[in-house]
Amino acid sequence: MENRNSSTSSRPFSVNNPFRNATVDSSINQYKNDSQFQEWAKNQSRTNSFDMPQLNTRTSSQLSFPNIPEDEPQRNADQQGAFYSGLESFSSGSLSPPSRPLSSKNPFLDDVSSATDFRRSPPPVSRNKNHPTAKEEKEQLRQRYLEESDVSTVGNTRENTDLPPSYEEITSTNGSRRAYPKEKVSRPSSHREHSNSGTYISRRSSSHHHREASSSSTPSKKGKRKSKVIVPKNVDTIDKLDVTGLFGGSFHHDGPFDAVTPHRNKNNKAAPVLAFPVDGPNSTIGGASTKKSALDEVFGRDDTDDSDIYQYSSQTLRRGGDTQDAIKANVGNVQQMDAKNKTELVHGPVTAGLGSSTFLDGAPASSAAIRNDIKAHSYHNRNGGLQRNKSLSQRLGLGGSGDSNAPMTGVRRNLSLSRDNYDVGHSNEGVRRSKTVNSPNRTHKSNYTTDFDGQDDHNEDEEDVYLGVRYNEPNMKKKSTGSKLLSRVKSLKVGRKSQ
C-alpha cells in the first residue's frame, strides 16, 4: 500500500478526476496498522468464490451441460490443482485470481499445459486408473486411425489385381490373338461398403498406368497419329506476314538488326550493331546536299548556312558530326572517308593562261609523288647561288651582240613566254626563237616551263624535268605539258598543207 500511494502521489491527477484527493483521505490508511484486519482480509481472499470454479457458470467458456459421471474425476483433479495453484499465488503476495482449469476435451490442452508448466508446479494428483487422460485418448485414436489406413491400403492392392484390362490391351495386335481375359471376381459386400474415395483414385491411377504401358508397346501408331510441327528457324514476323510466299515469289527480310523480333539480336559472340564498325567507311557518309531552287537563284535567295558545302573549311581533315571522337585513324586495311570534306588539291605545273594543273599524267598527284619528284631532281639545287646565264636576246634568238656572261636570274617571264607561244602557232621559226638554256641551278618550280630547246643543243646531257626521261638521241625533241596543245595544232596545220 505504501508503494502504491507513493507511486500515485507522484502521478498528477486531472482536474476532473473525482479521486484526486484520495491520497489525502485519512480513512483509507486507518486500517493500515491493524493486524487483525489484515489477517481477516487474507482469510477472505482464500475462501473466495473464484478459487473453486464451476463449469455451469456463465463466465465459463464451456457449455452449461449437466455434470457427466465420466468427466467427474477429471474435473475434481483439475479443481484440486487449481486450488493448490491459488494457494501458492496468495502465499507469494499476488492478489490475482488463479487461472481457470481447462476441460479434458480441449484439443489444445497439451500446448497450453506445456506453456504453463514453468509458471506453476502443482503437487501430484492421484488419478483414477479406469479413465484415460486426454493424451492417452489421443494416442488411442491415432493408433486406430493408422490401423484403418493400413487396412484400406491392403484392400487397394487387392483391388488393383482384380481390375479388368484396358481398352488398348484388348484392341492391340497381340491382344487380338490371345483370348479375352476372365471377368473380375465379385467381391463381398462388406468390403464394398468400406470402400472410400481413396480406392477410387487409386483405381484410376492404376488404369492409367496400364494404358501407358500398352501405349509404349505400340510406338508406330503414336508416331503416325501425332507428328511434331516443325517450326522454321530464322524467320521473323515480316517473313511470316509475307503473302508472296503463297505464290512462289517469297523474299527474306534479312539485316543486322531485327526490330520485329528482338530476341534474335542477342548474341554472345558479336552484337548486331557491330555489322557496321565504327572504323568503317559507312559511319562517315553524310546526307544529300540541299536542293537548288530556280526561284532562289533568280531572286538572289541563298541559304549558305544550311548547306554543308560552305559549312567547313578546306583545312578540316576529318569532320564526322557528333561521332568525330568515335572515328579513329586508319586501322589496318579500313580506309576512312568523310563525304562532307573536300580533299586538298595537289597543284602540278602551271600553264600560261590556264593556271595550275591538279592532274599529273591523267591521275591526281599525291603529296608522296611530288616529294619523290623533288628528291629525284634535288641535284639541281646542289650548287646553289646565282649563275651566269645567256642574255635575254640570245634566249629569244634575236642575234644581238651582247655580253653573254651577263648575270641572268631564273625568274620566268610570263609575258614573253606567252608571246613566244603565240608566235609558235603562226610561224615555223617560233620554236627556235623560244629556246632556252637549262642552267644547273634551276629550281624545281622553274623546270615546269613551256620553252623548247633548239636542235643545236641536242648533244648536251639534259633531262626532261617533268617526265624524268633522258633524251640522248639527236632527233628527239623535249616537250613539256604546256605546249602539247600547240604542237597538236601545228601538226594539224602541217597535215592540211600536205594534203
UniProtKB/Swiss-Prot annotation:
The modification Phosphoserine is found at S14, S45, S49, S64, S114, S121, S307. Residues 1-65, 436-452 have a biased composition (Polar residues). There is a cross-link at K135, K138, K292, K328, K445 (Glycyl lysine isopeptide (Lys-Gly) (interchain with G-Cter in ubiquitin)). Residues 133-147, 180-195 have a biased composition (Basic and acidic residues). GO terms for biological process: endocytosis. It is a peripheral membrane protein. Pfam families: Pal1. Residues 85-104 have a biased composition (Low complexity). It is found in: Cell membrane. The modification Phosphothreonine is found at T47, T153, T304. One of its GO terms (cellular component) is plasma membrane. Keywords: Cell membrane, Endocytosis, Isopeptide bond, Membrane, Phosphoprotein, Ubl conjugation. Residues 1-232, 379-499 are annotated as: Disordered. Residues 490-499 have a biased composition (Basic residues). The keyword Cell membrane applies. PANTHER family: PROTEIN PAL1 (PTHR28307:SF2). Interacts with EDE1. Involved in the early step of endocytosis. Belongs to the pal1 family. Present with 1480 molecules/cell in log phase SD medium. This is Protein PAL1. The lineage of its organism: Eukaryota, Fungi, Dikarya, Ascomycota, Saccharomycotina.
